[in-house]
């Protein structure tokens, strides 16, 4: 794993993009990833927590480097009395990953607050994309399809009261702990929400709550999560998610789609 310790796109471009013989992939915090048991071929570039400068453009607009953790950014914004980011503060990911997948929770999504993002293409060209050009939709954007690397994002928020903002952040954190299986390691929400349905409800109705393969288990606390109860392999997780998808399809006719992103050789 290579970390970019300099908060600049030049770090990525000079060390990797200009060297065509190097295979690489870029990750943020890795919180929604499932890595193959065979590992990943080539270099994994992690946009570390030093790649996390914040620039205050005006009273309600900020530019943030992609390595910034959402929790850290949320608390910084709260201290400044900026509201609108509370929904994301408890998501265990980075700004880059959040933009890539249009992360969301508790009624909010990145597309609600983003103005633009600077990205690198595979040739090392820096491109600025507007909110519309990012093609943000439910847990997706053009970033993955075009294989872009998020360098930074601009968010527009609203002025608010610091104490009120922090109280909401705390309230959402309490809800998250009550509803999600945070006592076990996981890659977060495992399946995307099918249109008109809730994945967890479909999985529970199919009788799959608590079902396990090896060390991987459908959480008994929230069926939308596959958790690692101890020494689970990526193969265990894949076998279990395939079983879940098959049984839900048989039971309800709904096709579940993974929200977790697979990296590496799963052949």
Locations of regions flagged by a protein language model:
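A gly/ser-rich beta-alpha-beta helix-loop segment of oxidoreductase catalytic cores
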Residues: 78-115, 186
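Structural signature of FAD isoalloxazine-binding scaffolds in flavoprotein oxidoreductases
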Residues: 34-52, 100-131, 145-152
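Acidic/His- and Gly-rich active-site-bordering loop/insert found
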Residues: 24, 33-34
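Hydrophobic pocket-lining residues that define ligand/cofactor binding sites across diverse proteins
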Residues: 17, 77, 248, 252
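Single conserved hydrophobic/aromatic residue that forms the stacking wall/gate
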Residues: 1-7, 12
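FAD-binding glycine-rich core of flavoenzymes that anchor FAD
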Residues: 9, 19-24, 49-96, 120
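Phosphate/pyrophosphate- and phosphate-bearing ligand-binding catalytic cores of soluble enzymes
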Residues: 33, 120-247, 251-267
């Amino acid at each position: 794993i290579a970390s970019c310790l300099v908060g600049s796109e030049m770090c990525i471009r000079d060390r990797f993009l200009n060297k065509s013989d190097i295979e690489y992939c870029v990750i943020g915090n890795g919180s929604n990833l499932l890595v193959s048991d065979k590992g990943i071929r080539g270099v994994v570039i992690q946009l570390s927590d030093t790649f996390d400068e914040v620039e205050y453009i005006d009273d309600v607009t900020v530019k943030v480097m992609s390595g910034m953790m959402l929790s850290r950014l949320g608390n910084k914004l709260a201290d400044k009395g900026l509201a609108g980011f509370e929904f994301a503060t408890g998501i265990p990911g980075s700004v880059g990953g959040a933009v890539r997948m249009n992360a969301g929770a508790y009624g909010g999504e990145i597309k609600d607050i983003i103005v633009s993002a600077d990205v690198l293409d595979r040739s090392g060209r820096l491109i600025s994309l507007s909110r519309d050009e990012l093609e943000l939709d439910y847990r997706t954007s053009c970033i993955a399809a075009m294989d872009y690397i998020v360098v930074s994002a601009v968010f527009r928020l609203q002025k608010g009261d610091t104490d009120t903002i922090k109280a909401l952040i705390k309230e959402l954190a309490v809800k998250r702990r009550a509803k999600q299986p945070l006592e076990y390691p996981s890659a977060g929400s495992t399946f995307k929400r099918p249109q008109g349905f809730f994945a967890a409800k479909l999985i529970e109705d199919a009788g799959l709550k608590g079902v396990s393969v090896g060390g991987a288990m459908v959480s008994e606390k929230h069926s939308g999560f596959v958790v690692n109860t101890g020494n689970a392999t990526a193969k265990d997780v894949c076998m279990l998610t395939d079983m879940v998808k098959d049984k839900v399809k048989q039971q309800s006719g709904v096709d579940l789609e993974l929200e977790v992103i697979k990296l590496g050789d799963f052949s």
